[in-house]
Amino acid sequence: MLSSLQNPRQAAAQLMNFGLILSTAFMMWKGLSVITDSPSPIVVVLSGSMEPAFQRGDLLLLWNRNLISETNVGEIVVYNVKGKDIPIVHRIVRKFGVGPDAKLLTKGDNNAADDTELYARGQDYLNRKDIVGSVVGYMPFVGYVTIMLSEHPWLKTVMLGIMGLVVVLQRE
């Protein structure tokens, strides 16, 4: 089992194999970002603000290539707020104006009030450039792994350790 560590070539090959897996995952993520024109083409719902449409832990697929159509009222979008690094998933409830200069107001389906309190200080509406993408699909509860890893940091260490052991103990 540990004899494979004694051969430096085999250990280097296993290390390169692990690097190949990581770089392939990174390239797939970046490719998906280019195709969808979204810096974050896949996001996880972190709260219950969009219930019953989406549950906590749902994995959302985003699309940001609205070349012909505009962002419309009723559309579920993911947006970033200046100064905060967690994207928010909510529905557009009002739209003022047309084209790239339109102002958008959002609200969670399960929230009592609109999102003006969530926006950056001095910001009353979202601009089109604040939108990360529109939701085009979802996979229920698949994102719960991400939530578990962020809520239990020790779980990251355990998973990385298991992945490392699999790579080291892998037989060819």
UniProtKB/Swiss-Prot annotation:
Residues 158-169 are annotated as: C-terminal short (CTS) helix. Keywords: Endoplasmic reticulum, Hydrolase, Membrane, Protease, Signal-anchor, Transmembrane, Transmembrane helix. InterPro entries: LexA/Signal_pep-like_sf (IPR036286), Pept_S26A_signal_pept_1_Ser-AS (IPR019756), Peptidase_S26 (IPR019533), Peptidase_S26B (IPR001733). It catalyses: Cleavage of hydrophobic, N-terminal signal or leader sequences from secreted and periplasmic proteins. Signal peptide: none annotated. Residues 1-14 are cytoplasmic. This is Signal peptidase complex catalytic subunit SEC11. It comes from Chaetomium globosum (strain ATCC 6205 / CBS 148.51 / DSM 1962 / NBRC 6347 / NRRL 1970). The lineage of its organism: Eukaryota, Fungi, Dikarya, Ascomycota, Pezizomycotina. The gene is SEC11.
